[in-house]
């Protein structure tokens, strides 16, 4: 898996700036590298250009009810139970206990921000980041949820950023 190496600032496992991540995916999603180490997912933090991201359509996420809201939204998109749990664990710790607008960013936008090459190419590549912006009464349009197609060899990436 190759991404734009200059943009990656942190990764697990370590991202090789020449060859990328060299992992083999099993049918159950487990990833194994050449050393035999296994991973449930690949993690990275990156520097990205915020102006690429849409802030027109989103979801109001209340501080008091965000876990249930995230579960409902992510489930409707088609994220797995484990992906939803990982998302909640990661973002609940990162965000202040405030209300947010959560703006979905789809594969095309994420590809612009952080290009990726996967060999062999998956049948379905689902890359979804969410932009989080503190809610202060700003106008937004409710985002429409279009469930993904996860049939066959599918790669799913989720992530986000705080605006």
Name these PLM-found stretches:
Residues 1-163:
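Protease-labile, long low-complexity intrinsically disordered regions enriched in Pro/Ser/Thr
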